[in-house]
Amino acid sequence: MTITSILQKMVKLKIITSSNFYLSTMLFNKNTLATFLSICVNHFTNHGHVCLPHVLIQHQKIFFTNHIALITKLWEIAKINTCGWIEQLLNSNTISNGSKNTPFIFYKNNFYINKFWLAEQKILKFISQKQNFKLINKNKIQKILKNIFNTNIDDTQKLAIILSIINNITFIIGGPGTGKTTIILKILLVLIRLHKKKINIKLTALTGKAANRLSESIHENIKKLNLTEHEKNIFNQKTTTLHNLLDLKPNKSFNYSCCKNKLYNLNLLIIDEASMIDITIMDKLISSIPKTTKIIFLGDYNQLPSISGGNILKNICSYYQEGFSTTTNKFLKQLFPNRITIKTIKKHQFSNINDKIIMLKKSYRFKKKSDIFKISEMLTKNKINNIKTLYQNINNDVNFKQISSKTNYNNIIFEITNSYSKYWSALKQSLPFLKIINIFNNYKILCILKNGLFGITELNLAIEKEMKKIGWIKKVTIINGQTWYFGKPILILKNNEEMNLFNGECGLTLLDANKKLKVFFLPKNQEQIYSIPIHLVPEHQTNWTMTVHKSQGSEFSEVVLILPTIMTSILTKELIYTAVTRSKKKLTIYSDENIFIKSLKKNIIRYSGLSIHQKIKF
């Protein structure tokens, strides 16, 4: 038996991908050990890891499959159990410690693909840079902050504002309702007033929906501020996605020089929903942004990470300890003596990183009695047993409903469909579009799978069937194989710049002035409501239900979460937390209790050398 024949079997059994097989065997066909390493490292990076800890190879914990004999044979042929296999690799042209250019890197007991190791080193250097406080005009900052701090903001929020002003890089971390957007308004105002000339600012997020929400929130709140016309003009700029800013497009190579030229005079970059940044985007961002640009990352690392490689925000926050280094603390106290309580941390090895992080803990959205708040707190603090008791009780704003049978499924469809009655009532009354879409967005059904009985495809079809039975859906039109009807909600699945539509945008199918069906979309950046004929709508899905992943960056008054009746690999604590924190007022969870509790005990693990401490799970 050869390594090639074993790997071919693994492809047939879907243990590894065919692309991994062909790439590894093509590059290293004469080197069994190098082929083995390539298969293992690529397998891990395909699952979101940045690196592969060598101890997992030692313990055969790479491929989680029942075909144990096959995996054992693979290890025997590659001679992994023999002494000196790593040294043998290091003596080849396949791998190095980073001192020379090789396909793989072995660094601090982790195996990397070369580009990921380089990216990780670049990120670490970027977040570790020292701040030069000598260049800061303390008197001018104090004068501006006096007016800003007269408003009702707590000490932690004040520290977040000051850190963002004195640091070139700041990470503002907080759950829902902790005032991240409020802080951004204050930071923008201070920085605008610090710059006599026009300041070049870019407001971005990781999804189109989150970018729109950031824009809406800022424009709603600037009305409360006493701004000059010059300040209003700066605030009234458009938000965009980080992908759009960096000109990152599928099937298009990244142009560093073009991106650098585009951003050469950028003074301030704000990135919302930063938990969704992957290692590749972070690498390209650092390479493109001028060293003088101030960057503020906003996010909640307890949420789902990016679909692609790494868990960057969580890794960076692993360096966090409450408080600041002596140098930073001294400067903060010079700015505001006796006004803010600041803890000093002595001898923190990574104080340069820690001094860039601030954690917002107080939620202004939820009352402490709120069960939604309690669940989110229990999830972040890993108090799973407390959630069990909450599951068994009847609560005001959280309701757990057991899934048990097919009959039960029909009852679920009836219940979740009837919750759309307010939306259909608004349509019947011909209310203005903005009111209709606000009513629609008050209620959202979330699930985790695309297919299966509890996936979005089946649930959307079942809801449509129930709506036809009720009499809400009447006349149905088929165009290009797509079903259309008055009131149909859709979700855009891919960016389409020509139509100014972006992944995650929601549209409603309504009648125009000529009684023709069109899909209407919310205005962006203070623009007008716009509509598109149904035959021109780009790739989309029906939006009575959506996945939790697609809901990131959105908020709803009432959320229904429907979990499948079998355990799946993507059911994790982070997914549940993300779903729970989409809701502002009411949450209903349909789930088998055992499945729900199992999900809470399962964390997303992504191996990376960027984290201060890497826990290995066997």
Swiss-Prot record:
Family label: Belongs to the RecD family.
Transmembrane segments: none
Quaternary structure, from the entry: Heterotrimer of RecB, RecC and RecD. All subunits contribute to DNA-binding.
A single Gene Ontology CC term: exodeoxyribonuclease V complex
Name of the protein this chain belongs to: RecBCD enzyme subunit RecD
GO MF annotation, one: exodeoxyribonuclease V activity
Remaining remarks: In the RecBCD complex, RecB has a slow 3'-5' helicase, an exonuclease activity and loads RecA onto ssDNA, RecD has a fast 5'-3' helicase activity, while RecC stimulates the ATPase and processivity of the RecB helicase and contributes to recognition of the Chi site.
Role this protein plays: A helicase/nuclease that prepares dsDNA breaks (DSB) for recombinational DNA repair. Binds to DSBs and unwinds DNA via a highly rapid and processive ATP-dependent bidirectional helicase activity. Unwinds dsDNA until it encounters a Chi (crossover hotspot instigator) sequence from the 3' direction. Cuts ssDNA a few nucleotides 3' to the Chi site. The properties and activities of the enzyme are changed at Chi. The Chi-altered holoenzyme produces a long 3'-ssDNA overhang and facilitates RecA-binding to the ssDNA for homologous DNA recombination and repair.
Binding site for ATP: 174-181
Cysteines joined through disulfide linkages: none
Organism: Buchnera aphidicola subsp. Baizongia pistaciae (strain Bp)
Gene field: recD
Biological process, per Gene Ontology: double-strand break repair via homologous recombination
SUPFAM superfamilies tied to this protein: P-loop containing nucleoside triphosphate hydrolases
PANTHER family: DNA HELICASE B (PTHR43788:SF6), DNA2/NAM7 HELICASE FAMILY MEMBER (PTHR43788)
InterPro entries: Coronavir_polyprotein_1ab, P-loop_NTPase, RecD, RecD_N, RecD_N_sf, UvrD-like_helicase_C
Keywords: ATP-binding, DNA damage, DNA repair, DNA-binding, Exonuclease, Helicase, Hydrolase, Isomerase, Nuclease, Nucleotide-binding
Annotated catalysed reactions: Couples ATP hydrolysis with the unwinding of duplex DNA at the replication fork by translocating in the 5'-3' direction. This creates two antiparallel DNA single strands (ssDNA). The leading ssDNA polymer is the template for DNA polymerase III holoenzyme which synthesizes a continuous strand; ATP + H2O = ADP + phosphate + H(+)
EC number: 5.6.2.3
